[in-house]
Amino acid sequence: MEGKSASCPEGVVSWYIRTSRLAVALAIIKLRPPGGARQFTESLAERLKRQDESWKSKAEGLHEDLLHLRQELLLTRTLLNTRSSAGQAPGQEIAKVLSQDDTREVNSGTLQTCLPPTPPNSQKVPPKDRQWRQDHRLTKHVQFLQRLSGLRSGFEESLCQDGDVVWDSVVQLLDCVVEDFRQAHTGQPLRHPEQLHNAIQVVAQTLSPGGARQGFPVQHFSRVEDLLKEMVNLLLTNQQLNAFSVQDSLSDCLLALGGNCCITRTPLIQLLMSQIIQLAQQLRDACEKSREEHEHHQVDWVCYQNSFYLFWLLERLAQDTDNRVNQELVVRLETKAFPLADEFSLFSLYMWRIGGLFRAGDS
């Protein structure tokens, strides 16, 4: 009798386990989408990808809002520490600078005529199309950097105390410019190229005065280098119908970064040289395979044609006497030029010329 009662709970537990397994199996079968396991996996992966992109977009938006608040705080703090020569009260000076739009000229054009209208409070503006948000984001960073650089007495102090805000703003502004070129790389028209060029000049002007003396944080400098690499890659691989106008604008932006900014000049020159050396090696490999296999091997003619933009940039950057270029790259550039003299004589001649220009500049 006792053995029978002892086995009863075990039977109940076993029955509950079988029932639970059956319920789980039925739930899986019911929730399983039509098709096979492959379709289910692809559907799940797509759903997770959309969710990840949504979270990433929200995180970027929160980062932008936080950075904007830190920008306003830094401007306010800098203004409080700055005394007007006319004896204006700090509160009045803060209100005046934060409320006015910066209309200082940059080269031949003014940013005020290029930038889209900025609402007084971005938090109250409903979300609009991607291009509007992109323009608005670029505008905010440009205005902050211009206003901060306008406070000449407090600019270097800001770099010492809150340099992270300044450098983060520089990286975000440069990313805004690159984003427009990314869209143009997919065939979309490049809107307001003068706005992008002026924004790049703001970046160069911000980096030039205090960056060399105060030091550029490693994490931000690494991000700037990545964006420079992406810009050069976009310049080298563009094959859209709007290539000429986009290439000219992108070349001008790179020239402004390399010519007016001592921090990015040397990395940009070395990056351009490395890209040319890499392309020269690809051309040489194609020529050797053609000789060995007695058949024509395809050459990346898009990169070959666009490489002359890189030569043009290097020729312009070589005119600056303050060039600290790795001479090993110059030697490699000249060495790679000789094997291409027969098949790609113009390319080889340009390589030899660029090597000579940078050797002369170094001597």
UniProtKB/Swiss-Prot annotation:
Annotated segments matching region Disordered: 109-130
InterPro entries, per database record: MEI4
Keywords: Chromosome, DNA recombination, Meiosis
GO cellular component: lateral element
GO process terms (BP): DNA recombination; homologous chromosome pairing at meiosis; meiotic DNA double-strand break formation; oogenesis; spermatogenesis
Subcellular location: Chromosome
Pfam family, one: Mei4
Principal localisation: nucleus
Family label: Belongs to the MEI4L family.
Role played: Required for DNA double-strand breaks (DSBs) formation in unsynapsed regions during meiotic recombination.
Name assigned to this protein: Meiosis-specific protein MEI4
Lineage summary: Eukaryota, Metazoa, Chordata, Craniata, Vertebrata
